[in-house]
Structures are given as structure tokens and as C-alpha cells.
Amino acid sequence: MARLAEKNNLLKPLILSNDVKYMAQNANTRNNIYPNIDVTDDDPENWDYTFNIEKKNFYTYYASKDRVNPSKKIVETLNKETDPKIILQYLKKINKLEDYSDTEALGILTIDNKINTQGNFGYRPINLVYNIDESTVLKIKENIKKTSGIAVNTIPIRSYPNRYVASHILGYMGPIATEAEIEKYVKKRDYLRDEIIGKAGIEESYQDNLKGKNGKSLVTVDSSGNRKETISKSPSEPGDDLYLSIDLDLQEQAEKSLAGVLDAIRNGHAYESEYGLFMPIRRAAYAESGAVVVSDVKTGQVLAMASLPNYDPNLFATGISQSDWESLQVEEDSGPLVPRPMLNIASQTAVVPGSTFKLVSSLAALEKGLDPQAINTCHGFLDIGNRRFNCLIWTEKGTTHGEENLYGAIRDSCNYFFYCLALGENPGDGRSVGVKLELNDIRIAAEKLGLDKPTGIEINIPKEATGNIPSINKKIEVTRLMLKNYLEKELPLHLKNDVKKSKSEFENDVVDIVNFTDDPESWTRKKILDFLDERGYDPERILEGKRAGLADTIKYTYLNQAVWDITDMLNIVIGQGQNSYTPIQMNRAIATLTNGGYLYKYTLVDKVTNHDSQDVLFNNVPEGNRIDLKDRKYLEDIKYGALLVAQNNKILSQLPVEIGIKTGTAEVEGENADGVKYDSYAWMVGFAPYDDPEIAISIVLTQGDTSYNASAIMRDIVAKYFDLDVYTTNTGDTKANVDRGQIGDNPTREIGDIIENLNPNDLKKEKQNNGAN
């Protein structure tokens, strides 16, 4: 048949018929088929970025309205102009908008441009503004005719009645914007180009479930794309209902307690909740952010995940304004610890865990054969070469813990005990401790507890961070990167006065020096001095504000760190060094240690149901496996040590429910914007109740100074979950008498005033001074 049509010259006219072309194009569109444009014969030099093309089209459109100057010349001039005010004034002039303010004119031009870019799709409505009030609606109806093409419609918009609560879980909405979103939603899922979609969090992950189906109107249009007649309509359909695992009351408590404690320790006043009073021992002047995670240890369901600062997702419901977006951002060079509202600390920030990691080291030691009852004497400190490693009790009081077994070492957070596990012996008396922990032992234990991978929560954007289990290769990689960054910034400053170098010469020198790390021990101080001198640098000049010259910095700060030695293990077993994990990863590790050894995939979703029928479309079933252990009693040994820690905490020991906790204080390098060194991260992890754990809790306070500061948050979470009638205080605790294991694990930096003598009776006055009701 085809050959017969071709022979009689019928095929080509049929294919090229406008009616047939329209039918084919319509069929393609209905089936979501968008034929690719063949550009293989085009010269790549003629290609341009979409943004540049759109800008040129914008200028060309408005240049055509200028009746005096040639369009081509206007476009060239506008493209070169960098001052947006000058461009706006020109556009106001040719559009006869000079009597309007810049803001009004910009609004008019924006609407005009939106209409122009519709092209042949003029029948598709353009959303000009959302959430207008009733008075505006009345003005539109009174002053604008129905035939003008402008109408007020009611459309569903996402509303978040609890505003900031769980914002990092829910995520936010926004219009389709990126090329990836156009490909994913417009081309593959038949979305309209200007639809609002989930951009982050659960909103993004479950976009297809939550969206439902758009209503449709079949219309006829004229040659300009204007709607002439509506042939048929089909109503929109609501999306599915999604139920989270989050306990709203617990989530609100976590956020409220986190905010209250951060404010109290930052400003040096008491924190009070319905469950008690907390008096900070000292100020933590830079404590402005933190996170709390609460999970069901028997299912892996996340019951609460708080991160501060947070944001109001209502700002994004119809597309966020530029000013609101900018208010949520921070300067790029403001430092890694500056509070960031858009950052979910709970799942995105992997930090050093401090002594909370001693529970992981304990599991590794027990698996290797440690007798938890065996006595090991703490001597306060030990020396490795010219470096001293202390227990905090020695640093602050000049005393020791004396005889310790594993339970006591966990309770007292005894660094010395864990140092001995890494050494295989007690250097104070030369006695063997029965086991010697190697790096691989730590790695195996950490991997069993899931610290090498994400927890599995259903948030694709922003992606959940993966922590870092220490390794020799990673240490060398990190050292090389740090040395490279240092040299790129500092090397030119050490150039001799009579020497000049090009950028490429500096780059070659940086590469050569970084390669010293391939064999760091062969690069003696003298060899480095000679190398730098030969390359035209002053190797011993100490710049203002620095403590060492170029050669000594390269040798002792970087090259010495490129060699793995026993001091690395001493840091790792107490949770320092290369260890870094997110709060939700640490939460899963604690849950696994206390639920009988089950490592669950974490989830934020309980179920998905059909909106109309309420039929269950998806019901979340716990996913987990039991980790391999030589003896499950090891888990009870670790739990018991954590119980002793809680019993030593004045606030938590008053609870009617027995719980287990582990504290941690982790040092971090760097400075705040005012030049003051970063304060420590404050950690606390725990579980409750002790006998048959139901929940795991992890808390981290950025620059929180001491883990003791997390006590009130832990109390509030436990009390809220178990609906306890309790009011506990730490009145009487001072810096002098509080248990060392509760204060922290590292020498602390004094920031701000000692506030231990603050009178609890002044609480009401403090609240009044801080604007509380």
C-alpha cells in the first residue's frame, strides 16, 4: 500500500498535510512524546546558554517597541550594561511607565513578559499572584471586566499550620525551574511548566503521591492562541494522604527544649520547662544551633528530628520571594559553624562524636576478648614521645580515677582506660589489659552499627550525609588536601623580596611540596629548608600572627600528620581524630546497641493511603537485620555502663524511669568571625527505659561547650514520651562539684562569665529581662 501511494505521489502530500501534522503532534503530546531536535550538524560555537538566550529574547522583545533606535543596537547596548537600574529606566521610558515607581513598573513589565513568553500557549493561564486578601479580590472584580482575561480563582495551596515545626523533615515547595526538573516533571510526567512541586524533604520525595491529578479543559483557540470556546472539562483529583512516623507532641518538645537550652547557655540564664529547671554551669556564648533525634528502637521509625535554626515552609508554598530567600542564607565566608536555617544538622552534619564513641570502642574491645570486670588503674595521663594524653580529671584537678573496670570507665568517661585498650597495656604499671585494639577492630564495630552508611530516611534532597570511619588512606588524603589549601593561600607570602614567580610556577611548587606526603619521613627539616630556599622562598620567616615559619609548618603541622602512628589510635578510641558521624547515625548506633543488636533502616513514613477511599497503598514494615556478635551479653555490658552515667547526672537520676546515657565533648578547629576559637561540640546519646528500651535519643549542640548542657533536653524528651509527672533541677551543681564525666572529656575554653552562682529565685526576673511572659 505504501509503495502504491509513493508511486502515485500520494504519500508526501498526506504526510505534509496540516491536518495530519496537527493530529500527529496532538498524539505525541497526549502520549508525552517530545521528539528531539537534531543539532548534530550545528557548529558548537553557535550554541549558547539558555539564560543568555532568554535574556537576549527579553531585550529583543522590548527593543522592538523603541520607535527611534535600531533594535539590534539596543540589544547590544543592553547586553553590555551591568547596572540594572539603567536598564529598568530605559524599559520604563519605551513602555511609557515613567509615571510609575520602579517597583510598580517592574511588576507591570514582569506580567507583560510572562504573557509574551506564552507564545502560542495563550490559552494556558498565568498565575500572577497568590494569597490575595478579600479586599483585593473585591477591587479586581469591581474594576476589571470578566472579558479582560484576568480572573480570580481558588486553587489548593500547601499550608503548614505548625509553621516551623519539622520544617527540615517536610521540606518546601517551589515552581519548576531547573533543566533537571523540566526533564523529570514536564517532559516525563506531563506537568505544566509553571507548576509548584516539592523541592526538598518529604515534599520532594513523595511529590508524585502528594500531587494528585490536574483538572483539564479542552478548548479551541484562534491563530494567536487566545481561548475561543471550552469544549469539555474534567475536575482535578486530590493526591494521596501521607502519614509520617513523627510524633507531633514529641517533635514540638524536642524543638522547644533545644531552642530553650541554646538560649540559656548562650546568654547565661536558667532554662525552665514543665519538667524542671536547668542552671548552666558556664556560658557557651556561640551556642546557636543543634539537633535532636528520637527513634523507636524496635522499628527504626523516627519519632522526632529537630534541627535549629529552622525555617517556615509556608514562605515557599507558592514560590519564595527574593528577600525571604536571602534572609535564610549566610555569607559564603562566614565559617562552617555559623547557624544555617536551611541546613538539617540531624542528617547533613557529620561531626566528631567525642566520648559517645567510647561505646563503639567498648563493643570492639569486648568482641576482641576484654573482660568487662577486669581492673585497670587510671594514672591520669600518659606520654607518647613529646606528646601527653590526659584524662580530663587530671587536666582540671590533677587527680586520677584510680581503679576502673569497663563499666566504671564508661561512667567516668575515663580517657586513660581507653588509651590502654589501644596500647594493649597500661604504661603506668606495665600490666597487660588483655586486648589490644587495632584500627580494623574499630572499623568492624563501627560498620556493624551502621556508621559507614546513611540510615535510610526518605529524604533525597538534601542528601543524607555519610559519616567517616577512620582509615590510614583517608588520613593521608585529608592531610594532602589541607597542605594544598594552606600552600595556595600562604606560599606567595613567603617569597623572597627579590624573587618573582608566575601563577603557573606557584602551582608547580604547590604540587611538588604536596608530594612530600608520598614519603614524609624522608623529608627532614633541613631538606625542606634547602628545597624552599632553592625555590626562592624564605623558609624561616615567621609572618605576623603566625607561630612558625613556612618550613616548620610544612614539617610539623602537615608532614608529621601524614604518617599513621599509635597517637592516631589514642585519638580514635575516645571519639576524636578522623571520626565523624551525623546525629541520626549516632542515634541508630545507640538503638542497635540497646535493642538486642538489630540494625534497622530508619524511616520517616508510616503509611500512604488513598485520599478518597482511605485504602492503604503503602504500609511501612520495619527493615532490619541482627548484627553478628560473639556474645549478646556484650550489649548488656555496654547498657550497664550507660546506666551508671545517667545515675551520676543530677537531673536525669531524679527521673522515675531508669535510662542510660553517654556524654561526649568534641573539639573542633577554627575561629568564629570575631577571632575567638570555636568552642566544643556537646553530645549526649541515650535510651529509655533501661530494662526494655523503647526509644533512642541523640543530641548535639554546636559550640555547646560541655555535654552537661544537653541534660535538660534529654530529661524533657524522656518525660514527654513517657508522660511523666516530674520536676527535676540541678540546683547545687557547680563547676567545682559536678561530676567530671558530666562536664566533658577535653580541656574546655572559658568563654563568657562563670554563672554557677546564678540564683534560681532570679528565674522570673531573668524571664522578664529577656522578654518572656
Regions found by a protein language model. Give the residues of each.
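Active-site SXXK
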Residues: 1, 140, 169, 253-257, ...
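Membrane-proximal periplasmic segments of bacterial cell-envelope enzymes
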Residues: 1-239, 243, 248-291, 297, ...
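Second-shell loop/turn segments in exported
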Residues: 122-130, 155, 191-193, 237-246, ...
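Active-site beta-strand/loop architecture of penicillin-binding DD-peptidases
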Residues: 155, 159-161, 166-167, 171-181, ...
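Hydrophobic "anchor" residues
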Residues: 301-302, 599
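A short, polar/charged loop-to-alpha-helix boundary motif
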Residues: 310-334
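Conserved active-site-proximal loop/helix segments of enzymes involved in bacterial cell-wall
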Residues: 372-410, 456-535, 539-553, 559-560, ...
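Long, low-complexity, intrinsically disordered segments
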Residues: 755-773
